[in-house]
Amino acid sequence: MRRPERAELVHIPNHFCLLVAAGVCCLANPAGLPSSWFMSVALAQPAALTASQSEALNAYNRTVQDFRSILKERRAQIDAKQKLPEKPGQALYLARVAMMGAYKDLTDVMPSRIGRPNKYKIPPAYFDADNEPLIDEYKNLFRIMQAPPANAQASDTPYKDVVDLGTVIARIKGLDAAHAEVAGRISLAVFFAETDGNQNIGNARSESYKGSFQTGVSEDKIGQKKWAAIKKSVAALDPKLNARDDKEEARVGNSDSRYNHWTGVRNGLMNAHADLFPRIPAIMKALPDPTDQMRFFELIQIIPSPAKAALNSGNLLNYRISEPRIMGYLRNNSMFAYGKADRAKTSATMREILDSMWLFNDIFDRALAKFGEVKAQQKG
C-alpha cells in the first residue's frame, strides 16, 4: 500500500440540540401525570454540546461532505471519459484521511459517538459504519484508476505464484520447509497490502510505483539482478518453477517487467525481502503473532532502512523512530495519520507502529484466507 499512496452526506443527528420534549415543559398536564414524570424527562435529556464538541461535529460533517464531493466529481469524470488530473487518487486519499481524522477528533471529545463495528475492521473510534458506502465507492474508483495497462501480462494463478516464489526464494536462502512456508505466507500478505490482491495494477497516487509489488524502476532492476544471481540454484532445487520463470522472461521481452505478474513479484521480493528471509525464525520469536510478522514485512516495503535497523537492534519492539521524514512516510501510508492526537506524535516505538497498522487488518485477513486456499489446493 505504498502510495504517496493507496452518496449522500451522512448526517450525524445533533440529538443534544433537540428541543426538550418538544417544549413539553410549557404544556398543560391533560393526562394528570405526576410532576416527577416531567422532571425525569427533563433530566433524561443530554447536556448541550460544549464549544469543542460543536466544533468537532461541524468539522466532521464538513469532511464527510468534502469526501462525498470528490468521490462524485471523480466518478463523473470517469463516466464521461474525461482526462483525469495527474495522480487522480491523491485528492480522494486526502479527503478520506481528513474524514477519518475528523471523526477521531469527534470521538475523542464525544466518546458516546463511537458506534458499531464496520466491515472494513477499522476501529470504530476512527470510522462511522454508516459511511461504509463511501469507502465502497472509494475502492471502486481506485480499482478503475489503477487498472492494469493494456499490455500487462496477467497470470491465471496469481496467488499461487506469489506463494511459490516466496517459498522457493526462502529455500534458496537456507530456510527449512516449515519456515519457507511462512515466507510464502508473508509474501502473499505483502502482495495484498500493496495491491489489495490485484495483479499488475498502476498507482493512482504515484508516478513511480507500479505492478504487482508496487516497485519503482530501480527497485525492479535490483531485484532482477539478485534473481539472476540465484537462478542456477533455483533450477537445481525446483526445475518446474525454473521452467515457468524462463517462460515468463521470454514473455516479457523488452517490456516493463513490473507489468508481468510473475516477474514483478519475483523482482519485488528479491529487492526488498529475500535478504531478510533467513531471519524469519528470529522474527517469529520476536513477533509470535502472524499478523505482526506480516506487518513487519510490509514495513520493509515502506521504511526498509529503519525497519532493518529495528531488527538489528536486538530490541525490535522497543526500537524508537523519531526522524520527521520517516514519520512522514508512515503517515503517508495510513499510520498515525488520523486526528490531532495521532498526528501530534513525533516519535513511535516499533510496537506502536505495528499497532497503528490497523488499516491493514482486513487486508491481511483476506491474504491469510487466500493462503489457506492455495495450500489446500496444493495438498489436494
Please state what every model-predicted region is:
Residues 145, 149-339:
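Catalytic glycan-binding domains that act on GlcNAc-containing polysaccharides
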Residues 1-15:
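N-terminal secretory signal peptides that target proteins for export/translocation
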Residues 45-138:
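N-terminal pre-domain segments of enzymes
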Residues 71, 137-151:
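Acidic/histidine-rich, surface-exposed loop or edge segments in extracytoplasmic proteins
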Residues 42-46, 152:
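Boundary at the C-terminal end of the N-terminal hydrophobic targeting segment
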Residues 13-37:
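Bacterial N-terminal signal peptides
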Residues 340-380:
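Low-complexity, Gly/Ser/Thr/Pro-rich intrinsically disordered linker/tail segments
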